[in-house]
Amino acid sequence: MRMNEPVDAQPAPSFLPMSRRFRGYLPVVVDVETGGFDWNKHALLEIACVPIEMDTDGRFFPGETASAHLVPAPGLEIDPKSLEITGIVLDHPFRFAKQEKDALDHVFAPVRAAVKKYGCQRAILVGHNAHFDLNFLNAAVARVGHKRNPFHPFSVFDTVTLAGVAYGQTVLARAAQAAGLDWNAADAHSAVYDTEQTARLFCKIANAWPGPV
């Protein structure tokens, strides 16, 4: 042992901490279900968020899911065809929908906590066709004048691109199956289910990719 070497010196970890792995951004998977395709015209109806966590070996895993059903914002439209696809029943007695501001507060709080936990600067949205989700999220933030949006305003990680490179698949169901994940078509088009499956897909790809040193 060298004279100046600390007795209890530990080897440096072979992976970057979360705060440095993605340039200070914490990946957070988001999925929204909506009343159509136009974020300035159609209502936001469901949202779910899953922060990506890191274990002591530097491997990624999905964190806890935060989700909310939303009361359609006044003046926005809902295309009946969208409800047919999602299966959302707006007047269901157990929907327990929140106003937009309350719903955003509900899902943003654990995201901010995860950003703080890992010493990151802010969250970066991960999604399948991620800009669709980000545009609806940003539109809702603007409508209610939310001042504590933890997400980067325009940058995303899109699992369409990642899965296309990793597995040659761009449809979420096919990409998940190519990654060896289970897929239940009956549960698809729920914000919670799609978010959790996208989070598993992102972790599977990210864990297979050697991080920077």
UniProtKB/Swiss-Prot annotation:
Any one Gene Ontology cellular component term annotated for this protein: cytosol
Active-site residues from the entry: H189
Keyword Nuclease: yes
Pfam families: RNase_T
One GO term of the biological process aspect: DNA replication proofreading
The UniProt record lists the keyword Magnesium: yes
Residues binding Mg(2+) 2, per UniProt: D31, E33, H189, D194
Cofactor binding, per record: Binds two Mg(2+) per subunit. The active form of the enzyme binds two Mg(2+) ions in its active site. The first Mg(2+) forms only one salt bridge with the protein.
InterPro entries: Exonuclease_RNaseT/DNA_pol3, RNase_T, RNaseH-like_sf, RNaseH_sf
Cofactor: Mg(2+)
Annotated EC: 3.1.13.-
Primary role: Trims short 3' overhangs of a variety of RNA species, leaving a one or two nucleotide 3' overhang. Responsible for the end-turnover of tRNA: specifically removes the terminal AMP residue from uncharged tRNA (tRNA-C-C-A). Also appears to be involved in tRNA biosynthesis.
Protein's UniProt name: Ribonuclease T
Gene: rnt
